[in-house]
A protein has these predicted regions:
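Phosphate/dinucleotide-binding and metal-coordinating scaffold of catalytic cores
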Residues: 2-4, 14-564
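Short polybasic linear motifs
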Residues: 10-11
Length: 564
């Protein structure tokens, strides 16, 4: 008891001491010092900064998006590959990484099983992808073909690849935009993949070119053509000492004009007389276009092709349409014309910037064979006219807004799903709006022609006119005040920005009594013109003097006169 009394008395004294003003002050000072020292230590160790970062808006957004993504239920594919076959694939991968190019053959295909929706489906499987970005990390790219009569997600053949290899959600947006315009588009989804018990997360699933693709796009079955790339990649694969993207054609055997034209499912089309006829007709059309024997309209559905090119410009998506190895064309047996199929839209190594395929066609810095391939289309005035008309339509105010609203039900669930692994992803519609603005400016720059007077005579003005930019123009007349003086339309070709202007002499009929120029060099006369295919008429001022000034001969005479 005494001991307890003594302990109680000690406790009461301690409490009394703490209650004193002086003691409270010292306790506060001591506490502050402890907190300060702890704070310094935490700062040095990065603990405090980590805590602050953990509560930052960016971190909260990331966590929220990941959690939202976890509420999604992507289709799940469980792939079982025998150990021996998997090691064979791993060896192929190592060889490809050394070459920095993947070369595959029928001997590289292995058997596997895919478990999906409660069923086990036998498949054939191989690695896929040309460059080795398809083989980096754990998410290797695969081509899968369901055996016998089986299908997976309604497809007989498809590819599985890291979503990044096709620029995540942007590839799906491109296909859905094409589908909305009535063009042939692949099915493109995101699925959860497990291989031999290892959960690899989300893959992009891309439909492969075969009958079901055509039927899913509500077309009658017909061959899908391509330019065979085997020689191209074989030539590039041998250049092992050169970085992949710096490799080129040594002798040209892997180029556009040398590539064999082939079809997917060739054996199927050659199996029957009717199929063989379609196959040969389709190849003849594409071959004749390549050699310049037929026009664009004679080989292709020219309206669909123009829309395809214009939409690719709107989405800055040229990797497929602008490079001949990626070109895919469906032969429509009803119209006997080729139609483009959207595929492999984005070059994920180079950020997309606004531009036009028409400009790429004359850009001398571009790969020569791909430029020649594209320029064949734009050499056809009828196609160029439709292309520009489609550019005006898809770049008009409101088109992108309507597209965004229409595609939201398709894209938003996929984006939410992707954010399970890639929470920073957005659907960037502002870049599409910037591309639309670029198109409008390219079609209607502040001034597209320069015009100078050569001679003036009763009833006629002779003018030198030059196109200042890349798109071809139609010169359609003169205007002064409210008076319009039409002339026979004359076409002026475009030019690359590295080339000088080329002046063309054009005669403009004018009414009798029309006087120009007057005593002053200022003139109200304007040249009226249109970009080929555009509905808009633009004007530019005409100069009342020669673009050559005094002329070279007169300059030489003056130089002699002024010589000492």
């Amino acid at each position: 008891m005494k001991i307890k009394s003594r302990e109680g008395e000690t406790r009461r004294k301690a409490i009394g001491t703490l209650r004193s003003t002086a003691s409270r002050r010292w306790v506060a000072i001591g506490y502050t010092l402890v907190v300060f020292v702890a704070g310094v230590a935490a700062h040095r160790l990065g603990v405090l900064r980590g805590a602050i970062d953990l509560l930052s808006p960016r971190t909260i957004t990331t966590v929220t998006r990941r959690l939202q993504g976890l509420t999604t239920t992507p289709e799940r594919l469980i792939i079982d590959i025998k150990h021996k076959d998997f090691m064979n694939l791993a060896h192929q991968r190592e060889v490809a990484l050394k070459r920095q190019v993947l070369i595959v053959s029928d001997a590289d295909v292995v058997n596997a099983n895919v478990r999906y929706a409660g069923k086990t489906i036998p498949v054939k499987l191989r690695l896929k992808g040309d460059l080795t970005d398809h083989l980096e990390g754990d998410k290797w790219s695969f081509r899968i073909i369901a055996r016998s009569d089986s299908t997976i997600l309604g497809m007989k053949q498809f590819s599985l690849q890291h979503p990044q290899t096709r620029d995540f959600i942007n590839e799906k947006r491109y296909h859905e935009a094409m589908r909305r315009e009535g063009l042939l588009a692949l099915r493109y989804e995101f699925v959860d993949v497990t291989i031999n018990g290892k959960d690899l997360g989300l893959y992009a699933l891309e439909e492969v070119f075969e009958t079901r693709l055509v039927e899913n796009n509500e077309r009658k079955d017909g061959p899908i053509l391509r330019f065979n790339e085997d020689v191209l990649w074989g030539e590039l694969a041998r250049q092992e000492s050169v970085a992949p993207r710096d490799r080129g054609f040594v002798a040209g055997s892997g180029g556009y004009f040398s590539a064999d034209i082939d079809a997917f499912q060739t054996s199927k089309w050659l199996a029957t007389p009717a199929g063989r006829d379609q196959f040969l007709t389709a190849i003849q059309l594409l071959s004749s276009f390549r050699t310049g024997k037929v026009t664009v309209a004679e080989a292709f559905d020219i309206k669909k092709l123009a829309t395809f090119f214009a939409l690719s410009d709107l989405f800055s998506a040229w990797h497929g349409v602008g490079n001949w190895p990626n070109a895919r064309f469906y032969y429509n047996p009803i119209t006997s014309r080729l139609e483009p199929v959207s595929f492999d839209a984005y070059n994920r190594t180079t950020p997309a910037k606004p531009g036009l395929l028409a400009l790429q066609a004359i850009d001398e810095r571009r790969d020569r064979t791909s430029r020649r391939y594209i320029s064949q289309f734009f050499a056809d005035t009828a196609f160029y006219r439709l292309y520009v008309s489609e550019l005006e339509r898809v770049s008009a105010a409101g088109y992108v807004d309507e597209m965004q609203r229409a595609l939201a039900p398709k894209l938003d669930p996929s984006l939410k799903m992707l954010r399970r692994e890639f929470p920073e992803l957005e659907i960037d519609w502002q870049s599409v709006r910037r591309a639309a603005e670029f198109i409008r400016i390219a079609l209607h720059p502040p001034q597209a022609v320069q015009t100078y007077l050569r001679t003036a005579a009763p009833g006629e003005l002779v003018m030198d006119v030059a196109n200042m930019q890349a798109l071809p123009l139609r010169i359609i007349g003169l205007a002064r005040d409210t008076t319009v003086l039409p002339s026979t339309p004359q076409l002026l070709g475009g030019k690359d920005d590295s080339q000088p202007m080329q002046f063309t002499t054009i005669r403009f009929p004018v009414p009798r009594g029309f006087t120009w120029p007057n005593d002053t060099l200022e003139t109200p006369l304007r040249v009226r013109y249109q970009v080929v295919g555009s509905q808009q008429i633009d004007e530019a001022p005409a100069m009342a003097w020669s673009h050559e000034g005094l002329g070279v001969a007169q300059l030489r005479v003056n130089a002699i006169r002024l010589a000492p």
